[in-house]
C-alpha cells in the first residue's frame, strides 16, 4: 500500500511538473521573442525537448558518451544562436525566469558541464556553434574569431590567407574556441609562443545585463578574467581577437615508439631532463600506455614520442643527436611538411590529406574520463619503474606528458588567470576511453587509481590541475547559499587557479553578484 501511494504521488508530481514546465517554456519563448532583434528572428534557433530536431542538435556536440545516455539530464530547451541578439535575449530571459543557462561552444568539456546539470533543476543550453566566423587580417597578423568556431576552422582559414602564419592552440581540430581560450588552451607551439591566452588582444562579450562589451568597455579586470579564468562564470564571450604567430614554410614532425624492452625507462628518464630545456621551437610530447609484450601473455609499457619542430629535419637531428641521443631518432623517422599538414599529422591523419578535413565538426566519440597533474621535480628511475608496474597492473589508463619550459617559463603566473608557468617541468593528462557503457564505473575507477598512485610524484599544496581538463572529482558546487558556494568553489578553484583564484572571485562578485553565470565548477561570488 505504501509503495502504491508513493507511485501515485510520483506520477502526480511528474504530471504537475510536466504541465508546469510546458507553461514555463511557452512564457520563456515569448520572452525570448520579445527581447531579440526582429530583423533576426530567434524562433528558428529554438529547439524544445521533444521537437524533431532537438535530439540531433543536442547530440551534435556531445563529445563524451557518458553524457549521452537515457538517464543523462537534458535541457528543456536549446537556443542555437545565429545572431548576437539571441545571446542577449537568452541572458535577459534566463535571469527573468530564474533558469540556469549552460553555455556550449564545441562540447569538449570532459565532464559535460557545458550541457549537463548535476542539480536536477530545469536548465537550458545556449549553443554557440552557429556563431563561428573567422576573419583573418594578414597585414596586422590578427584575426577575430567567434567562439562557436572550432580550432580546425581557425587553422584552415588562417592557412587560406597565409602559409607562414598560425595560431598556437590545441591539437584537436574539433575543440571549440570559446572553451579552449577561456580556460587557457595550449598546443604544440606553447614552448615557443605560450598559450592561447598569451596571444589574445581583445574580446567581445555579453554581460549579465545583456550589454555587448569590448576590452575597453569591460575594463582590464574583466578582460583578464575571461582570458584564462574559465568559461561560463562572467558572461558570454562572443569573439576573441587573436594574434597570429610566424611559422616557417616547412616544419618537421615525428612519431616513434619505444617499449620497456627497447629502453623506454632510460629514454623517459632522460626526456624529463631535456624536454623542458630544448630549444623553444621543439616540443616533444610522450604518450604512455600498456600494450602486449613480445610474449602475447605478457604486458609491457609503450612510450610514444610525438614532436613538432619549427625548422628542418637536418637541424632537428643535429639538436637531438647532441642533446637527446637516447631517443635514437633517424632521418627516416621525420617528416618535413607545411604547418597546416602538421596539424593533420598530430590528429593521426596522413600527411598529404586534404586540408578541408579540418572543417569537419563530427568525429567518432567514446565514453571517456580525463584527469590532470603537474610535475615539478624529475622522477627517479625507481619511481618510473614503480609507475610502469602500476600501469601494467591497471592496464587501461594512459598518461600524456606535455613538456613546459621555453616561453612558458618566462611569463609571470599572474599575467593571465592561468597560473602554472615557471617551475613546472611538464603536465600530465590521464585518460581512459571505452565503447561499452557497462565498463564506465570500472574504467573511471582505474583512472582514479593511477591518479592516486601518482601522488608522490606531482605538485602539492595544492595539487595543481588544468581547468581545460575538467574533472568533477576535484569538487562540485551546488550553489546553495553564498557561504557554502564559496567554500565549495575554493576546493576546486585553488587547484585550477592557485593564487589567482581570489582575484577571480572578486571580479565575479563585481560583475555578476547574483551568480547567474554558473555551473558545477564556476567561479563563486564572495559570501
UniProtKB/Swiss-Prot annotation:
Query: Where in the cell is the protein located?
Result: Secreted, Cell wall
The EC designation for this entry is: 1.1.1.-
Keyword Glycoprotein annotated: yes
Q: Which UniProt keywords apply?
A: Cell wall, Disulfide bond, FAD, Flavoprotein, Glycoprotein, Nucleotide-binding, Oxidoreductase, Secreted, Signal
Name the cofactor(s).
Answer: FAD
- List glycan-bearing residues: 51, 68, 250, 263, 292
Per the record, the similarity remark reads: Belongs to the oxygen-dependent FAD-linked oxidoreductase family.
| Name of protein | Berberine bridge enzyme-like 8
What species is this protein from?
Arabidopsis thaliana
